[in-house]
Amino acid sequence: MNQLPTWHDVIGEEKQQSYFVDTLNFVEAERAAGKAIYPPAKDVFNAFRFTEFNDVKVVILGQDPYHGPNQAHGLCFSVLPGIKTPPSLVNMYKELAQDIEGFQIPQHGFLQSWAEQGVLLLNTVLTVEQGKAHSHSKTGWETFTDRVIEAINQHQEGVVFLLWGSHAQKKGRFIDRNKHHVLTAPHPSPLSAHRGFFGSKPFSQANQILVQQGKEVINWHLPMTV
């Protein structure tokens, strides 16, 4: 088997592409114009900082970053310590409490410990303007994150993709189901969680698949405070 690439290889290759240069230039220009862009520049690529390429076991796919102050820090669904847990994550915690024995709902929404265990918390779009959801969609980020998913699809085996809602499911349509495991459910948003996200048991299912492959499971439990 060929040696696995690193994120440095994958992202480095994309950095040479004109679309990606344009994306980064657009974001930089927006910041330079005085607009509040989230997450801060140092956090935009945190999903890759905390989960190395060859450590990826599970991928959770989000849409775009939270657009309120101090929320987004580069990991989908996660917020910084001290920030109120957003509604979709509240529902993820409710499902975890039903799905994972002994799971206690923490007083925060900081999911970095998942990332450090091999859960790639990837948004489709990696930046957003304050108060304007989807404001940075169609600026090139989607192409970049497609390439990220394609790299995992091509070079890894047995990764569990948790695709919640039609956006994530459409994004993941080219994943090779013979090599990887794709678990779908409605989005945990309050608008759709009751349509089948609750009761879908994605977290225990992911761990069962990892056990079958002889991989270490994800400890979904979170510290009560951070």
UniProtKB/Swiss-Prot annotation:
<dbReference type="GO" id="GO:0005737">
    <property type="term" value="C:cytoplasm"/>
</dbReference>
<comment type="similarity">
    <text>Belongs to the uracil-DNA glycosylase (UDG) superfamily. UNG family.</text>
</comment>
<keyword id="KW-0227">DNA damage</keyword>
<dbReference type="InterPro" id="IPR002043">
    <property type="entry name" value="UDG_fam1"/>
</dbReference>
<protein>
    <recommendedName>
        <fullName>Uracil-DNA glycosylase</fullName>
        <ecNumber>3.2.2.27</ecNumber>
    </recommendedName>
</protein>
<keyword id="KW-0234">DNA repair</keyword>
<dbReference type="InterPro" id="IPR018085">
    <property type="entry name" value="Ura-DNA_Glyclase_AS"/>
</dbReference>
<comment type="function">
    <text>Excises uracil residues from the DNA which can arise as a result of misincorporation of dUMP residues by DNA polymerase or due to deamination of cytosine.</text>
</comment>
<dbReference type="GO" id="GO:0004844">
    <property type="term" value="F:uracil DNA N-glycosylase activity"/>
</dbReference>
<dbReference type="Pfam" id="PF03167">
    <property type="entry name" value="UDG"/>
</dbReference>
<keyword id="KW-0963">Cytoplasm</keyword>
<dbReference type="InterPro" id="IPR005122">
    <property type="entry name" value="Uracil-DNA_glycosylase-like"/>
</dbReference>
<feature type="active site" description="Proton acceptor">
    <location>
        <position position="64"/>
    </location>
</feature>
<keyword id="KW-0378">Hydrolase</keyword>
<dbReference type="InterPro" id="IPR036895">
    <property type="entry name" value="Uracil-DNA_glycosylase-like_sf"/>
</dbReference>
<dbReference type="GO" id="GO:0097510">
    <property type="term" value="P:base-excision repair, AP site formation via deaminated base removal"/>
</dbReference>
